[in-house]
Amino acid sequence: MDWRDQGILLTVRRHGESSALIEVFTEDHGLHAGLVRGGASRKMAPHLQPGAQLDLTWSARLEDHLGTYKAEPLRSRAGMALSGRLALAGLNAVCALLAFALPDRAPYPALYHRSSALLDLLDSEDLWPLAYLRWELSLLEDLGYGLDLSACAATGVTQDLRYVSPKTGRAVSGAAAGEWADRLLPLPPVMRGEGAAEDIEILTALRTTGFFLESKLAPALGNRPIPEARGRFLDALARRV
């Protein structure tokens, strides 16, 4: 059997003398691995870089086999990734998180398009941090761990929302938090699409989303550690503050 699709290259590993084992996030087939014969050759290897947009034809005798890919480059993002430390760290974080979090062969077309659009902003460093935060929030949402920041979980008010409950992922107002405030996670305005989206606020927001990646998503995936590439991206962003 075979199919054709577009995909974002997430990981690539040499296999044997000249082949490459790749993982791609495709529009219609989700996270899908396969072997590219000649993928480690001088001709093909430069096109098989993480973040690359590929036209893919997958073939296998049976659906549950690893299968092989024919991969044609559509768009390289290597140049954008090399435009600065933040861009490279961001690309690595996105690819690593997708490879970590996505179930095999389950389509997430909306997340695929958001991921592709995010990577196309790699060389726009002023836009990238906020776009990344929105993407990470959508990643949690699509995988079943979305945050409800619309109103206070305790009172229903929509004003003065300052915290997120680590148990429920719901917003909590300053008044409702009371003496429990130090046990809650910060909810900077940028997480609700408000405020000036300064880097320091985005960093705070990413520490909150990171809590849910570690405490909710990771346990569902066998308690594997969150990819270090995400931490390196936060470090690169912190250097700008």
Curated annotation (Swiss-Prot):
Tagged with keyword DNA repair: yes
A Gene Ontology cellular-component term: bacterial nucleoid
GO biological process: DNA recombination; double-strand break repair
Keywords attached to this entry: DNA damage, DNA recombination, DNA repair
The keyword DNA repair is annotated on this UniProt entry: yes
UniProt cross-references to SUPFAM superfamilies, sorted A to Z: ArfGap/RecO-like zinc finger, Nucleic acid-binding proteins
Similarity field: Belongs to the RecO family.
NCBIfam families linked to this entry: reco (TIGR00613)
UniProt function note: Involved in DNA repair and RecF pathway recombination.
PANTHER family, per database record: DNA REPAIR PROTEIN RECO (PTHR33991:SF1)
Name of the protein: DNA repair protein RecO
